[in-house]
């Protein structure tokens, strides 16, 4: 059984430094934080060759160790992917300030005015997979939202993560934000000890399996924002446009199969299965996708048999489970039983069927006639995401800047005391004022 160690003196010192830097960061203005992100982007561009070389080292070592192809795809950070990450930082810098937004403005009595204002969380701890571009996304989201961050990436990406973090800190050193606002955890012991840093860390965001999320929730007093498996479904309804549904299915599986928002199971209504699968099966085969079907779908060109395990497997690869269902009820029941509450989609031209599906599926994202690959903070216009939350409580779905802030009530008075309201000397007006 894995035990959670006490944090070392060195880790406590680093966490304390992040906490102090986060306090100062929370006092910076919008322009200072935007400038800090531009400086981070500049430093990443300057150190691009070093970062890409470090990534090649990680790739070579991981290939020799037999890392799965899906994880190798996530691990890769070439020059083009790095440029995209840098562009994302610059775009994030240009987004509206998430801090200082007045969400409520109410007069309680003459001269007694209540406000609710958005403020940073403080310090976030993020444990994520072997995806080094996630370091860039998470760090930039944290700084833009006024939060310090302690980051622990997959060990497969350790060289890349260290090179990226060095560049990010170099950029912060040229800005009004202290480099201590970010720190990188590099060992398993440190990531476990992070769970005991309540009082220094305000939120933990694990990006990984259900088992990882459950372990963290069971072993920390720090609030946890759960991001678990991405077992996403596309349901092809009886009234689907076949050509459109095939395009959506192909994109949802093949555009980036290692992503958590790629579909892992395709559900097809029995009445449209012959026509749909006649087009879809050759298209998937041409794209290099291995299909595993139930008994009914195997009557339409799928040779490999699916097992019960396939319905609950996140392949992150060019493998797709296919099931023919007799009704939408059966599709909804399958999703309830096997889904991970991430993202589900329906392809249909029937408005009534569409509204029923959109209302009945309890996932963070429910889509009509479009690819599940849109479940992404950048594509939602959030700039980037720190993760995708599959829990019911907010924030839910892709967590961007707005998911990394909380709020504070500010009350301004002029000698007001509660006793005057208790004895009837004064009375509340409760008048909403302009935001």
Swiss-Prot record:
Protein name according to UniProt: Gamma-glutamyl phosphate reductase
Pathway assignment: Amino-acid biosynthesis; L-proline biosynthesis; L-glutamate 5-semialdehyde from L-glutamate: step 2/2
Keyword annotations from UniProtKB, A to Z: Amino-acid biosynthesis, Cytoplasm, NADP, Oxidoreductase, Proline biosynthesis
Compartments where located: Cytoplasm
EC numbers for this chain: 1.2.1.41
One of the record's GO cellular component terms: cytoplasm
Superkingdom of source: Bacteria
PROSITE patterns: PROA
């Amino acid at each position: 059984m894995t035990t959670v160690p006490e944090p070392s003196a060195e880790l406590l010192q680093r966490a304390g430094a992040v906490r102090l830097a986060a306090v100062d960061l929370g006092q910076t203005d919008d322009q200072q934080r935007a400038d800090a992100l531009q400086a981070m982007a500049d430093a990443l561009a300057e150190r691009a060759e070093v970062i890409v070389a470090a990534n090649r080292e990680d790739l070579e070592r991981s290939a020799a160790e037999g890392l799965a192809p899906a994880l190798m795809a996530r691990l890769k950070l070439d020059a083009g992917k790095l440029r995209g990450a840098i562009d994302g930082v610059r775009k994030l810098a240009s987004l509206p300030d998430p801090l200082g937004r007045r969400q409520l403005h109410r007069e309680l009595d003459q001269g007694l005015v209540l406000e609710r204002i958005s403020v940073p969380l403080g310090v976030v701890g993020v444990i994520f997979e072997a995806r080094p571009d996630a370091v860039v996304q998470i760090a930039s989201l944290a700084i833009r939202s006024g939060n310090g961050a302690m980051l622990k990436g997959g060990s497969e990406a350790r060289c890349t993560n260290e090179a990226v973090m060095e560049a990010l800190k170099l950029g912060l050193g040229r800005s009004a934000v202290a480099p201590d606002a970010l720190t990188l955890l590099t060992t398993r012991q440190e990531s476990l000890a992070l769970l005991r840093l309540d009082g220094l860390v305000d939120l933990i965001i694990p990006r990984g399996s259900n088992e990882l999320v459950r372990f963290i929730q069971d072993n920390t007093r720090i609030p946890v924002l759960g991001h678990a498996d991405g077992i996403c479904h596309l349901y092809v309804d009886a009234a689907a446009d076949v050509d459109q549904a095939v395009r959506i299915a192909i994109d949802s599986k093949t555009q980036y199969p290692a992503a958590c928002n790629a579909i892992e199971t395709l559900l097809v209504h029995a009445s449209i299965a012959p026509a749909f699968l006649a087009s879809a099966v050759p298209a998937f085969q041409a794209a290099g996708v291995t299909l595993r079907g139930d008994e009914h779908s195997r009557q339409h060109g799928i040779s490999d048999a699916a097992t019960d395990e396939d319905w609950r497997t996140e392949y992150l690869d060019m493998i797709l489970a296919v099931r023919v269902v007799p009704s939408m009820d059966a599709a909804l029941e399958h999703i309830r039983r096997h889904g991970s509450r991430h993202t589900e989609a329906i392809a249909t031209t029937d408005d009534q069927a569409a509204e029923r599906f959109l209302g009945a599926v309890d996932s963070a994202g429910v889509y009509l006639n479009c690819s599940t690959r849109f479940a992404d903070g950048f594509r939602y216009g959030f700039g980037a995401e720190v993760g995708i939350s599959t829990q019911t409580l907010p924030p839910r779905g892709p967590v961007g800047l707005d998911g990394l802030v909380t709020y504070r009530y500010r009350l301004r008075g002029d000698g007001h005391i509660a006793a005057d309201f208790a004895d009837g000397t004064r009375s509340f007006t409760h008048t909403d004022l302009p935001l």
